[in-house]
Amino acid sequence: MLRNFSMIALGVVLVAGCDEKKSEPTPPPPVPAAAPTPAAAPSAAAPAAAAAPAGGKGDVKGTVTITGKAPEMADLKRTTDPFCGKTKMKDEEVVATKDGKLANVLIHINGAPAAEAPKDTATIAQENCMYRPRVQGVVAGQTVAIKNGDPTLHNVHTYKGTSTLFNQAQVPNTPSIEKKFTDNGAMLKFKCDVHQWMTGYVWVQNNPYFAVSGADGTFSIKGVPAGKYEVEAWHERFGTKKGEVTVVDGKPAEVKFEFTGSETATAK
């Protein structure tokens, strides 16, 4: 009987051993995933931008006016040079009509996509001892040709802020001085050390979405990609004004800028 009991016990042990080999090990409990870091809340001063309209392009048009009385521009003292002195001219720092339409304001789109520089050459002409045009924009990397069309010596002194970019004399009947400017967002100032009244400005931007207001204060920026943008207007004496515009495919968008005439420009 004792022998039978031992055999039964041995059988139980063997069966238990087989069951242990067949059972899979119990996996460890899953580790809880780390809680995601909460995103920073939008600043109250900078609300989330509105969704941009669907693709396409449109034009941005508008006018620039001066609501106060335009300052009187003095006659330029040009008689130090016999050629320049033949033509009387007024200072062109402020050019406005009697009803307040303001010329020579550079309007540009902020945040528009970058584009390659065009193959066209932008021109700065020295005519009648004045820079023409007085204000213009170029695409970063675009060739700029500076021409002397006068029968007198000029000196092209170009500044970025207070730093000289180049300073080069240009005698009559000589080839153009050609330059490429790549400083996106820079307003360059052109002077002539021979004729101190000569002044010109070139805005450099990495896309072609800019324009200059004409004698009637109007401007038009062609083919702006659809979207919501900040638009900035700059005047050499009155400084900057900003606005917003939403461009929709095939539809002109309009923005207007008003200067009071009492503003003072700061360095660009």
Predicted features by range, described:
Residues 6-13:
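Bacterial N-terminal signal peptides
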Residues 1-5:
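Positively charged n-region of N-terminal signal peptides that target proteins for export
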Residues 20-268:
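Extracytoplasmic copper-binding redox domains, predominantly the cupredoxin/blue-copper superfamily
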Residues 15-17:
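C-terminal motif of bacterial Sec signal peptides marking the signal peptidase cleavage site
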